[in-house]
C-alpha cells in the first residue's frame, strides 16, 4: 500500500508543473517504475521537458539534458579522456548521460553515430570510453523526445534504438481549458517551483523492487 500511495504522491507533484495529460503522466511513471525508457514523439512546446524536470524533482533524481543537433558528438554524451599535464595521465571527463534522468531532447536531429552513443547506456547501464567501461548512476532513466516524422532536419531513429524504449507517448496540444490554466499558473507564479520531493533514490528503488515482485501468470506472459 505504501508504494501505491507514494506513486500517487509523485503524480500529484508532477501535476503541479504539467497541466492535464494525466494518462501520459501515469504511463510515464509506470515506465520509470518498470525500469524502462520513454520516447516522446510530439511537436515542440507541449510540455515534454517540463514533465521530465518535474519527475526528476519529485523522485530526487540527478537531471541531465542534451539538446541534440547535427553537431553534437558522441563524446558529448558518453564523455571523453583528457590529458592532464600536471599528472601526465589521461583523465576521464564524464558525459551528460552520467546522471539518473537523462533528457535526450530532439534525438532524431542528431547523426546516427551520436544517436547510437546512447544504446550501450540504455541497454547495459554503462558507457565505454577508450576501452574502459563505467556504470551509469542508478536508477537510470532516459526520456527522449523526437519531432514528428518528416519534420525539417530530422532523420528516422533506427529500429535498434527504438527497441530500447519501453513506451512511446505523445502529449498533444493542450485543450482550451488547459491553456487557460497554464496562463493562470504563469500569472500567479505556479509551475516547477511548486514541485516537491516525494522520495529519494533509495525509495524509488524500493518501489521498483515492489513492481518486480508482482506475479504475472503464464496466460498474460504468453499473450
PLM features per residue range, with description:
Residues 27-30, 83-104:
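Conserved alpha-helical scaffold flanking the Walker A/P-loop in AAA+ ATPase domains
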Residues 29-35, 43, 94-97, 134-136:
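Phosphate-binding P-loop
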Residues 84-89, 110, 114, 122-214:
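Canonical AAA+ ATPase core
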Residues 43, 77, 145:
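P-loop (Walker A) phosphate-binding loop of NTP-binding proteins
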Residues 32-69:
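Walker A/P-loop
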Residues 17, 44, 107:
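The conserved Walker
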Residues 1-24, 213-215:
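Dynamic helix-loop-helix/coil hinge segments at AAA+ ATPase domain boundaries and subdomain interfaces
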Residues 42, 105-106, 117:
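Walker B catalytic acidic pair
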Amino acid at each position: 500500500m505504501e508504494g501505491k500511495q507514494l506513486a500517487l504522491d509523485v503524480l500529484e507533484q508532477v501535476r503541479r508543473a504539467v497541466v492535464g495529460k494525466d494518462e501520459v503522466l501515469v504511463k510515464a511513471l509506470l515506465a520509470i517504475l518498470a525500469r524502462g525508457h520513454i520516447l516522446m514523439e510530439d511537436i515542440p512546446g507541449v510540455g515534454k521537458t517540463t514533465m521530465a524536470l518535474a519527475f526528476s524533482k519529485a523522485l530526487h533524481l540527478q537531471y541531465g539534458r542534451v539538446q541534440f543537433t547535427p553537431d553534437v558528438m558522441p563524446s558529448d554524451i558518453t564523455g571523453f579522456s583528457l590529458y592532464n599535464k600536471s599528472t601526465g595521465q589521461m583523465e576521464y571527463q564524464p558525459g551528460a548521460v552520467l546522471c539518473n534522468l537523462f533528457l535526450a531532447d530532439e534525438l532524431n536531429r542528431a547523426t546516427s553515430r551520436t544517436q547510437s552513443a546512447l544504446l550501450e547506456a540504455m541497454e547495459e547501464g554503462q558507457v565505454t570510453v577508450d576501452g574502459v567501461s563505467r556504470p551509469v548512476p542508478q536508477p537510470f532513466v532516459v526520456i527522449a523526445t523526437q519531432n514528428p516524422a518528416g519534420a525539417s532536419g530530422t532523420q528516422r531513429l533506427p529500429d535498434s534504438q527504438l527497441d530500447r524504449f519501453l513506451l512511446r507517448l505523445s502529449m498533444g496540444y493542450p485543450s482550451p481549458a488547459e491553456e487557460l490554466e497554464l496562463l493562470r499558473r504563469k500569472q500567479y507564479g505556479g509551475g516547477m517551483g511548486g514541485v516537491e520531493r516525494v522520495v529519494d533514490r533509495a525509495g524509488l528503488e524500493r518501489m521498483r523492487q515492489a513492481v518486480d515482485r508482482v506475479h504475472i501468470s503464464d496466460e498474460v506472459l504468453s499473450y
